[in-house]
Amino acid sequence: MTQQTFLVEIGTEELPPKALRSLAEAFAANFTAELDSANLEHGEVSWFAAPRRLALKVANLSAAQADREVEKRGPAIAQAFDAEGKPSKAAEGWARGCGITVDQAERLVTDKGEWLLYRAHVKGQSAQALLAGMVSNSLAKLPIPKLMRWGDSDVQFVRPVHTVTMLLGAELIPGTVLGIDSARTVRGHRFMGEAEFTIDNADQYPQILLERGKVIADYETRKAMIKRDAELAASTIGGKADLSESLLEEVASLVEWPVVLTAKFEEKFLAVPAEALVYTMKGDQKYFPVYDAAGKLLPNFIFVANIESKDPQQIISGNEKVVRPRLADAEFFFNTDRKKRLEDNLPRLETVLFQQQLGTLRDKTDRIQALAGWVAGQIGADVNHATRAGLLSKCDLMTNMVFEFTDTQGVMGMHYARHDGEAEDVAVALNEQYQPRFAGDALPESLVACSLAIADKMDTLAGIFGIGQHPKGDKDPFALRRAALGVLRIIVEKNLTLDLQTLTEEAVRLYGSKLTNAKVVDEVVEFMLGRFRAWYQEEGHAVDTIQAVLARRPTKPADFDARVKAVTHFRTLEAAAALAAANKRVSNILAKSTDTLNDRVHASVLKEAAEIQLATHLVVLRDKLEPYFAAGNYQDALVELADLREPVDAFFDNVMVMAEDEAVRVNRLTLLSKLRELFLQVADISVLQ
């Protein structure tokens, strides 16, 4: 069967830059699934994405589906006909579904009986007949949060569509997609190359777009060009460009023909904290800041134009004029804010609502101040500095700088606190209180900063759960999942001695009578343990390993971490599987028993050699492992417990647990209970698969 290249390009208005990659990747994935579902053989599916187009190119696409043999078994003969030999309703319904009458059906005879059978040779449809519908289906499934209409059409898409091109080799595939008829015409760059031109063959794409339209359709090529040229431009002025992945992706999504240029701003603006300048350059203007070898911001920036100009200096001057007022605003705000102390903003926090039922930001500040001090006392941080940081934690939200440049919250608090002469760890804590902001983000460095970060997040968790506004599905408006994981990461990775139970109780206590959910403490702790499960699964720990530990409900995160790692190591031991199975057997035996167990194993009642041996091992191990458990050394404890495999196997091979003699039976059950208790000091390994 002949195979050809298939091309589809959707020409649009400017697509959302932050969604461009995900739209293109989803388009490719959806279309690949359509091809596979239709049994159309194909090679690689490549995607292309630029500001005004989404495209796919499929290599070696079959011209048609393969022919296939279809067999559908119907009702058994006994149910297919009545006593008079007339077809039953079941038989007629089945035949109708197959497009035949009952008397046209074949018979399938096996040693198990006889059934009606429909057998047919189905000729494969041509790709030409299928492709337009498959493209439409693929586009309809794109992850578009908000659709729009244009003109007088009812068609909806992420942006208005102007052209649709579908080619199978040199053949134009007819069809209407998103209200536009398929044609050979594609559009080039707005200001360079040919405005419109036709494509004769799918294999010409994307080269023809490059040559005639001055559009680089390959997303990764544009991104690599920008990265390479920006690095070169920065090194030319003796610096290094801040090419963050997210901004690099966004800029690559904004241009069809990237031209990297270097500009500068007045050195006087460097007196403003670099974070504010960078926020303006990256967030507002999509510029790449440049730093020197020591990491100090230079009075230069790199930007990407979407046109190759005969007079690039004019474009450079234009961008310098655009950014200057924004930098001047930052300078003005910085100087104005410093005319009063950070602490002077406290009264204004009373005018801003944190949450209707939970009070103002000033109320939140008071709670954070108290909780940060409590946490500091638990982890050995400077309590006075932690409470001071708590008091100042939200003051920068009232400054001109943060009001205008919202992403500078925290970092501006740090700069203003330093200006006011606050202790350095207090100032740094104001910046680090929001860390970690995202997966993989850095944690607060000092214990004072950890105290504040934990207090801020726990106050939010306790408050929102306390009024019953739990995260539901994908909706998490207060970012409680991120807050919970942040607290857990800080405690685990900093190895802090904090208990989630008492921490949550303290956070709830500070709300007084504001909270209406009586189960708030338990629900917050369970929610955080659930975050543990998700986190450790991502880290590669087996689900049943995590469940084994969660069965013990350890509320100290550092302790939870040690237990999970211990069980993960235990599973590598040769004895692990047998001991897990034995624990499961013990658990089942104890669950079914109605006997009241003894407080201890009575040596005088032990009869069999195997039970005496097991009891002796347990006594020795119990005493030996006590300091291991006390120190949280669970890994070595489980290694020691692995030595129980032979005596446990011998016990089950040679001892009848449910003996008729009640004293013997209860003593043996007690022995098994003590065995299980020893393992439960670490985890419930009976749940291991």
From Swiss-Prot:
Q: Which SUPFAM superfamilies does the record cross-reference, listed alphabetically?
A: HD-domain/PDEase-like (SSF109604)
Q: Which domain of life is it from?
A: Bacteria
Q: Name one GO biological process term.
A: glycyl-tRNA aminoacylation
Q: Which UniProt keywords apply?
A: Aminoacyl-tRNA synthetase, ATP-binding, Cytoplasm, Ligase, Nucleotide-binding, Protein biosynthesis
Give one Pfam family. DALR_1
Q: Which family does it belong to?
A: Belongs to the class-II aminoacyl-tRNA synthetase family.
Subunit text: Tetramer of two alpha and two beta subunits.
The record's annotation in PANTHER family points to: GLYCINE--TRNA LIGASE, CHLOROPLASTIC_MITOCHONDRIAL 2, GLYCYL-TRNA SYNTHETASE
Can you say what this protein is called?
Glycine--tRNA ligase beta subunit
What organism, scientifically named, is this protein from?
Serratia proteamaculans (strain 568)
